[in-house]
Regions:
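Outer-membrane beta-barrel channels and translocator barrels
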Residues: 194-196
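Extended extracellular/luminal ectodomain segments enriched in beta-structured repeat modules
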Residues: 11-14, 23-32, 38-43, 49-51
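Residues on the lipid-exposed face of transmembrane beta-strands in outer-membrane beta-barrel proteins
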Residues: 187-191, 226
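Transmembrane beta-strands of outer-membrane beta-barrel pores
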Residues: 176, 205-209
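Extracellular beta-strand ligand-recognition surfaces/modules
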Residues: 29-32, 47-61, 90-162
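Outer-membrane beta-barrel translocator domains and adjoining extracellular loop/strand segments
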Residues: 162-164, 211-218
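Exposed low-complexity, polar/acidic, P/S/T/G-rich flexible segments that act as propeptides
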Residues: 1, 28-31, 56, 61, ...
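Transmembrane beta-barrel strands of outer-membrane/channel proteins
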Residues: 199-205
Length: 226
């Protein structure tokens, strides 16, 4: 869990915290995190719903090679809440919850656009989440979910005036581990060319998810091999 209290956040500006990690996310299907936002007590900046956003970045770095997912924030009114009012404190629309393959799909779309327009990978490319059209996905550079080295969580001011805001984030997690098994095939071919000689050919093919009986899920093959 983490609390971020941000003061005098200028229009279009952002503040964030990051952590260096080494993680392969390819065997997970979704990423989730609860998010709460509220106006700071005594604040006179007249903060409104959706004027600030929370975002998460995943990549080999947080400036040149990353995926970003951004969610507009609904504010929780000041007050006292009991356990039955949990959704008022942690609104569902604030929750970061999306399939990881959405990130790679946006990257694929970006690469097609670059090919057709002679663009560059260093220019941010954004699309909106088709399941949650208010949420935005951005890709910069050449990030790889198989080699995530940094994770960043931040808050951005989307309004035209400076804002103060308090944001809580909790239970960041990867879910829906891919337990589907793969398969492997081995072929050997020997051809006798009469008096000329003989030729032997061998081939092996393994799909993602294949592994030995003694191997754990994490030790199984993560990509196709042939």
């Amino acid at each position: 869990a983490m609390l971020m209290k941000i003061l005098d956040l200028a229009p279009g500006d952002a503040r964030a915290v990051y952590k260096n990690i080494v993680y392969d996310m390819r065997m997970y299907r979704r990423i989730q995190m609860f998010v709460h936002a509220e106006q700071i007590i005594g604040d006179d900046s007249n903060l409104q719903d959706y004027e600030t956003t929370v975002f998460i970045r995943l990549g080999s770095d947080h400036t040149q090679n990353y995926y970003e997912y951004e969610v507009p924030l609904k504010l929780t009114p000041a007050g006292h809440y009991n356990i039955t009012e949990r959704e008022k404190v942690w609104p569902e629309e604030n929750m970061i919850d999306f399939p990881l393959d959405l990130l790679t799909q946006v990257k694929t779309n970006r690469n097609r656009r670059i090919k057709n327009t002679n663009g560059t990978m260093s220019t941010p490319f954004s699309e909106y989440d088709p399941e949650k059209p208010q949420n935005k996905v951005t890709v910069v550079g050449n990030p790889n979910l198989g080699d995530v080295q940094t994770m960043l969580i931040g808050v951005r001011n989307q309004s035209r005036t400076s804002k103060n805001v308090e944001v809580w984030v909790n239970e960041l997690r990867l879910t829906d581990y891919d337990e589907d098994g793969g398969w492997a095939a081995l072929a050997n071919l020997a051809v006798n060319l009469s008096d000329v000689g003989s030729v032997s050919v061998a081939g092996r093919y393994e799909t993602a998810g294949f592994g030995g009986i003694e191997e754990t899920l994490q030790e199984r093959r993560l990509d196709d091999y042939y």
